[in-house]
């Protein structure tokens, strides 16, 4: 900000991002000198300061007209500050929102999933997946440093934002309208995450935080005994099938199967432990070297480590077959209550290099690695209507997730002309998810309060078995963009063109081993008198004993898939007076390929090549220097994800439901229209209001199949989605609240799905679409005292989690809705000297329940709402410290 000096003294300060400043000085008459780069220096005389009374000054700076001879400047545009972010938002040809590293540093957010919640119009689902304008996360596209990201999940089309530590983010931008230079698969938002770059100066920082959750910390939790490698998030290396274990037990004789079964680990019982406070440690260092000829070289390295516990105690998990209108009672498919425990270890590493010379050449090499190891156990008890009995289900698993993204990129001024630039990018990304040994076992109630081990007659992975799963995804990318700014008469048109290629592969494998009753010479009483783990020793495991092992691997639960995307675009920007027009056309060729099985004798081969054109138009009209009107149109696409077209059935042992793919899914096509008014009363204040409309053809939704907890994916005939969005960033100085500011974003959305004529009586919202989203925050920042604080509020309206499927226009099972939660977060930061900063925060102060529900006809002209899932994750209190060396 501007520098303010009391003339004739050494007393002075600089203005903050909002232009506010405070100088403490005794009574008297003073002269102030105010200066800022490219503005005229101002000298204010006869400033009277009275005892006990603040003197308020409003100073307007005037731009300086400057004529310079040829000067060679080597500079790096700062992209990590609030001011630079707001400038990017205002000058962008698209509607865009974002958050800077400067704002992130004022919070206790540990990863990108928490950071992104602070972006206007954005919410997070399941603490990992982003929702823009209330639209399902499948309609977003996420890029990291100018290249696509791999899916970190095996069963959903989404990028998991919790793999990127917050201290590695330079800025995060969300484009809400399309343009030719961006991928066509971005209907909700196109999210670009930029990691940090060349530092301004050499530095080293260390950060530590500790957190207490009132539902988890210092309470009892249950896990299988851990492994040494768990601490590094690499526990899969010490789990899984033993070396040399047979590839297919069905090919072995009985004695061979028994011998292989004894090689497997015999630990099944989760042991009690105390959930420790969540902790995070991060160390970052940056160095820069000024080279000859004005060139610079910089490197930045960041390492973070965290461990966290979470618990869902007494989680309600009910599924209904129907509602009995005669007796006014629900008929349950199952009625469970569960305790679920998680222990999470993560390591994050970022290592970036950058080189920049005086002739407009910049080279970057960026690397991001995240390793997460999550140990989970669940105890579920309740009524199973299929089996007509009460059961207790026990499940333990370890899952490992690794995500890596590496990119080499460059930008060049052609012929030394910064109006004629070429940039390029090559990238490689990898993600895996490995579950090396999920163990499930159960007990059945045989009389009131008396439970016995379930030794299935028919093999059942849910009742007694082990599951081994692995998923590996690779992405190779390359792209280049050429931009030419020309001066034709009084116009300054810009032409931009580029190409992009992406090749993605996935290999998914699952192996299922189950145990069944061996009908040996043991009575039920004898068996149940034994500790459960004893059943897996040589005396009881094998043919003619208590248990025998079976290979139940289903070939349909394994698949390979590939996707090739090539794209090219041309875009032209023409400023005409107060009007700025940008028109573009993007061409994309996409080929989705998948090799799988319905069953051993019915292979599935998907090969779907398609070519399409995606026009876009972004226009803006500058009503005056502070007011802007935007109008935008674009066509976008939403393609099925690998998992959605793979015919495998995935059973979620925690949630107790199954999801099966649909190889017949079609692409969804969307037309988007946006109108937005923007007002910038000051460099740090904004007010915007927007209207948007989207029409979908063949939208992809998750639907229930028949009665029960089996879900799949299907195309609806069509859908419309329209609404309004308001955003306000306002300093509260005008009402006497110095250093306070207000941020509000609210969206109201109406959506409806189109059905075939035979189903015209059915009306509902688009699956995953919320009718409203509200984000609000009040901020306090006093740079002189080194204090900042904020209070954040968020709510998202009820939305369909799983849509009902129709049969001849009849709803078989009602839609399952995710219900609203009001969330309030608070954080407080205090700087002590120039090196230490303390942070305090409370997340989810209200700690409202997470709920899903269905609504049934009660038979009397009314309706009744029944809860499916209900649980509470509690509130979290955090304390952290950041030290700059």
Located regions from the model:
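Outer membrane beta-barrel strand-and-loop segments of large Gram-negative receptors
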Residues: 467, 471, 478-479, 527, ...
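Transmembrane beta-barrel wall of Gram-negative outer-membrane proteins
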Residues: 262-378, 404, 617
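C-terminal beta-signal and adjacent terminal beta-strands/loops
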Residues: 519, 795-804, 830-885
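Gram-negative outer-membrane beta-barrel transporters
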Residues: 691-696, 712-803
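Surface-exposed extracellular loop regions of Gram-negative outer-membrane beta-barrel proteins
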Residues: 148, 432-434, 450-455, 527-548, ...
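Periplasmic N-terminal accessory/gating domains of Gram-negative outer-membrane beta-barrel systems
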Residues: 48, 53, 77-79, 83, ...
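Signature of Gram-negative outer-membrane beta-barrel scaffolds
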Residues: 372, 463-465, 469, 481-626, ...
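Periplasm-facing N-terminal accessory domains of Gram-negative outer-membrane beta-barrel systems
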Residues: 1-70, 74
